[in-house]
Amino acid sequence: MDEDDGLLLNFAVPDVSVSSGSNKRTTSKVTGGKWKDRRKLQLSLQGRGRNQKKDRSATGKDDGKKHENDESNDSKKRPTIEPIHGPTSKMIKFSESKGEFGGKNNSYVSSLFTSNQSSSQLKVTKESDEKTYLPSNAPVEDASTFEGLGINERLSKHLTETLRFKNPTKVQKSVIPTMLSTERDLFIKAQTGSGKTLSFLLPIFHKLMMENKHKINRDSGLFAVILTPTRELATQIYGVLETLTRCYHHIVPGIVIGGEKKKSEKARIRKGVNILVGTPGRLADHMENTESLDISQLRWLILDEGDKLVELGFEETITKITNLITRNSQIMESMHKWQGLPVRRINLLCSATMQNNVEKLGSIILNNPEMISDGSSSGKHSEEVTAPDQLIQNVVVVPPKLRLVTLSAILKKISSDMSGTNNSTRTIVFFSCSDSVNFHFDVFTRGGNTFKKVKNDESGKLETVEVENDTPLIGQGTAVYKLHGSLSQQTRTSTLQAFIKDSKSNHSILFCTDVASRGLDLPNIASVIEYDPPFTIDDHLHRIGRSARVGKEGTATLFLLPGNEEGYVDGKLQVVHPKEGNLRIVNYENYLKDGFSAKSNNEDTKKKSKDPKSREGKWDIHATTWHLDIERWLLEDSGAHDKAVQAFTSHIRAYATHLSSERNYFNVKLLHLGHLAKSFGLRETPKKLGKSVESNSGIQGASKKTKKEDPRKKMLRMAKMALKSNSDEFNYS
């Protein structure tokens, strides 16, 4: 029998929707149980529970309010796709204007063409404003010849017939007669590529050849020393001397540079040299430690690229060298023997720029010098040095995220123009640091040109053999080389020679630092690209001076970032590019369109599609795909990723070393580090990259510390050593 007494109890439970929607929130005190359970129940009574959103979506009810917690949680989890209520019912994807997290290894994925700062100060140069000029450093087309300047017939014939030098340049017309007729010290200032090297080599060679009383040979002694700031420039001058000795083999040149074996250099000096080319540090070392180096008969001391010598800190070393030469000089005692040579030491200082530090070096080395500047003897020390008139200087203002694809587009365009032709061209790309050179070299040679050393069966020597002859990321028939100061001297020399002598490739590209910007006469350099801005305006002049040499045409391209860097054009470049129409502002999109506008022959793809992203041949899609391929490669290859991180951090450090006078154009605090990291193919935020660099440096530092040896292993090791010493004590075999 049911014991129901018929009593009914009614409990009034507050409605959640009503309580949440009312202005006056119902507060019910919950007691008993755990704190977490009480908190959950309290929140549910107030309509703030975690499951409220699910309940509303399940029941189809919504209070119409926007909850801050819901919005923040959704934005952190993933982008949402919401329908657009309007004339169209299409769905749009999440906007990548600020990027999004969620990539591999929790990386940050951003779009390539969004949130880019546009150029606000510079206007693109119109075609009607572009002008070209006649070469300013070309050989003089008149009746003047080398023989007419005073060079002997034998050497002049060798220059014109063998070396193909038809006429002397302006600076040669001024320097050669002065060196032949007087014995004054000279300060030579002229444009890069104007023939300064031959202007001082030819008079020295002529004087040594014309010594009649005693014929000059390797046993006669050392008569000339040429100092250069870089090993590459010393090697080049030594090569020019070797070509001159073909008409008179009795004169022997020599070279001493860092990175080579001192023992081999001492052996060559012991045999005897008449003209010695070298870098200051190695030459000073030989003067102090090589007894066979006799400098008592020295007649000429030439300092080439004097501004760079001072910049690299060789001022004290050069002073030491000159003091040693002066102390050991015996010119007065041998005047009667070498009657055709100068009766005093002649000092020459060559420089493309005139700075206070160069003038200071000249005051130390030179004695009452004569100034020769661009073909005229004048005392105008304030004269500005300018770029060659025929050089076309392009300036492209590129957003930081688009730097890498823009460089790729320029190189692709040059290679495509040269493909299928019998002509060849060379391009030099300058970077600010060696880590950046290594990274970009790996990027553009990925899956392309490879070289290996094989043993020749006949000679038994190792030879470098080319395996492939194309670079897929740039174009067929393209070879890429790299050169920087961190490479060994043997690698630097062989790389430079391979780049110069490469006749198989239609387009040869050299990625390098400023080590290749001074004095090198590289043939057929049609284009110079300054991917990273120069540290000084003088560095800019020397960089672009690799092109447009001795009257030839040339093009230089400078990359700048939007913002303060645009002021560099009016503040600095206009001074060294005074010719109207030579300095041109180019839109970076023109390069991207030329490099990434792939033409399709398919009839279906030629038809315009309603969806713009489905069009084939759209340059921005191809550029994005190219860049994403680099990013995926870095995600898959940890070694390449580490190189990219190292290149990025080294680039920032190098950027911070700009001169204080140019800091208003290149301020490291104004860089958008995130966008700049994108140009290195990195998806991590700068903060995360900084932590990874610190952790890697910490790991490297910890690995350098030697671990404490285990006592047991130490005891066993010492026991084995004692046993071995006892067994070997009477072993006389």
UniProtKB/Swiss-Prot annotation:
<dbReference type="GO" id="GO:0005524">
    <property type="term" value="F:ATP binding"/>
</dbReference>
<feature type="domain" description="Helicase ATP-binding">
    <location>
        <begin position="177"/>
        <end position="372"/>
    </location>
</feature>
<feature type="region of interest" description="Disordered">
    <location>
        <begin position="1"/>
        <end position="92"/>
    </location>
</feature>
<dbReference type="InterPro" id="IPR027417">
    <property type="entry name" value="P-loop_NTPase"/>
</dbReference>
<feature type="domain" description="Helicase C-terminal">
    <location>
        <begin position="406"/>
        <end position="596"/>
    </location>
</feature>
<dbReference type="InterPro" id="IPR014014">
    <property type="entry name" value="RNA_helicase_DEAD_Q_motif"/>
</dbReference>
<dbReference type="GO" id="GO:0005730">
    <property type="term" value="C:nucleolus"/>
</dbReference>
<dbReference type="InterPro" id="IPR014001">
    <property type="entry name" value="Helicase_ATP-bd"/>
</dbReference>
<keyword id="KW-0690">Ribosome biogenesis</keyword>
<dbReference type="Pfam" id="PF00271">
    <property type="entry name" value="Helicase_C"/>
</dbReference>
<protein>
    <recommendedName>
        <fullName>ATP-dependent RNA helicase DBP7</fullName>
        <ecNumber>3.6.4.13</ecNumber>
    </recommendedName>
</protein>
<dbReference type="GO" id="GO:0000464">
    <property type="term" value="P:endonucleolytic cleavage in ITS1 upstream of 5.8S rRNA from tricistronic rRNA transcript (SSU-rRNA, 5.8S rRNA, LSU-rRNA)"/>
</dbReference>
<feature type="short sequence motif" description="DEAD box">
    <location>
        <begin position="304"/>
        <end position="307"/>
    </location>
</feature>
<keyword id="KW-0539">Nucleus</keyword>
<feature type="compositionally biased region" description="Basic and acidic residues">
    <location>
        <begin position="52"/>
        <end position="80"/>
    </location>
</feature>
<dbReference type="InterPro" id="IPR025313">
    <property type="entry name" value="SPB4-like_CTE"/>
</dbReference>
<feature type="region of interest" description="Disordered">
    <location>
        <begin position="687"/>
        <end position="714"/>
    </location>
</feature>
<feature type="short sequence motif" description="Q motif">
    <location>
        <begin position="144"/>
        <end position="173"/>
    </location>
</feature>
<dbReference type="Pfam" id="PF00270">
    <property type="entry name" value="DEAD"/>
</dbReference>
<dbReference type="Pfam" id="PF13959">
    <property type="entry name" value="CTE_SPB4"/>
</dbReference>
<keyword id="KW-0698">rRNA processing</keyword>
<keyword id="KW-0547">Nucleotide-binding</keyword>
<dbReference type="GO" id="GO:0003723">
    <property type="term" value="F:RNA binding"/>
</dbReference>
<comment type="function">
    <text>ATP-binding RNA helicase involved in the biogenesis of 60S ribosomal subunits and is required for the normal formation of 25S and 5.8S rRNAs.</text>
</comment>
<keyword id="KW-0378">Hydrolase</keyword>
<keyword id="KW-0694">RNA-binding</keyword>
<dbReference type="InterPro" id="IPR001650">
    <property type="entry name" value="Helicase_C-like"/>
</dbReference>
<dbReference type="GO" id="GO:0003724">
    <property type="term" value="F:RNA helicase activity"/>
</dbReference>
<dbReference type="GO" id="GO:0016887">
    <property type="term" value="F:ATP hydrolysis activity"/>
</dbReference>
<feature type="region of interest" description="Disordered">
    <location>
        <begin position="119"/>
        <end position="139"/>
    </location>
</feature>
<keyword id="KW-0347">Helicase</keyword>
<keyword id="KW-0067">ATP-binding</keyword>
<feature type="compositionally biased region" description="Polar residues">
    <location>
        <begin position="17"/>
        <end position="30"/>
    </location>
</feature>
<comment type="similarity">
    <text>Belongs to the DEAD box helicase family. DDX31/DBP7 subfamily.</text>
</comment>
<dbReference type="InterPro" id="IPR011545">
    <property type="entry name" value="DEAD/DEAH_box_helicase_dom"/>
</dbReference>
<feature type="binding site">
    <location>
        <begin position="190"/>
        <end position="197"/>
    </location>
    <ligand>
        <name>ATP</name>
    </ligand>
</feature>
